[in-house]
């Protein structure tokens, strides 16, 4: 189990997350990198930032382990997942806009899995492999009234059912961040 917790800020100019294991120990962090002063200013005064490119680094104690890039978007999002050296692992592609949101997990041009929202509210997601078997779940946790009203910080529990092969394992790690940057950051607060 992993808990991905967005850092609480009243005004959020960059995305930052802490990653905890099942026993509550911080095992990593995720930081938004490469954001110019102009993009930060745009994020402060408008919501146009949601349409621009975002770069996130997933880090452990030794340094970056994954790099996620969400290219500029108009309607549907996609997130490119790669190693810190630039080696591509795959991409997470939003398959639909209306109804229960779904993302396809694609590696080397083939479908290796999917992320499926369980309802229109998009708080609970099932992650499946290419055969449609659930391999993990993402659950958005309610932050409490004050945190919800005054910040954009969200928390996600990622429950992986068993050890997964690559690139699916890395795609599952990237999934909660994809849900947050592709869906949740776009629909509230200063984002």
Predicted regions and their residues:
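Low-complexity or membrane-interfacial segments used for flexible interactions
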Residues: 1-55, 61-64, 71-78, 84-89, ...
């Amino acid at each position: 189990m992993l808990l991905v917790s967005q850092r609480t800020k009243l005004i959020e100019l960059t995305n930052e997350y802490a990653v905890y294991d099942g026993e509550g120990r911080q095992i990593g962090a995720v930081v938004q990198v490469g954001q110019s002063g102009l993009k930060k200013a745009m994020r402060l005064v408008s919501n146009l930032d949601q349409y621009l490119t975002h770069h996130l680094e997933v880090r452990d104690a030794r340094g970056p382990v994954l790099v996620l890039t969400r290219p500029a978007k108009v309607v549907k999002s996609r997130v490119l997942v790669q190693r810190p050296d630039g080696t591509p692992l795959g991409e997470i592609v939003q398959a639909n806009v209306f109804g229960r949101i779904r993302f396809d997990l694609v590696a080397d041009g083939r479908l290796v899995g999917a992320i499926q929202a369980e309802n229109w509210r998009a708080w609970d997601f099932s992650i499946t492999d290419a055969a449609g078997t659930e391999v993990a779940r993402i659950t958005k946790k309610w932050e409490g009234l004050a945190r919800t009203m005054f910040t954009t910080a969200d928390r996600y529990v990622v429950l992986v059912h068993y050890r997964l092969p690559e690139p699916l394992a890395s795609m599952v790690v990237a999934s909660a961040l994809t849900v947050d940057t592709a869906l949740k950051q776009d629909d509230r607060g200063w984002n």
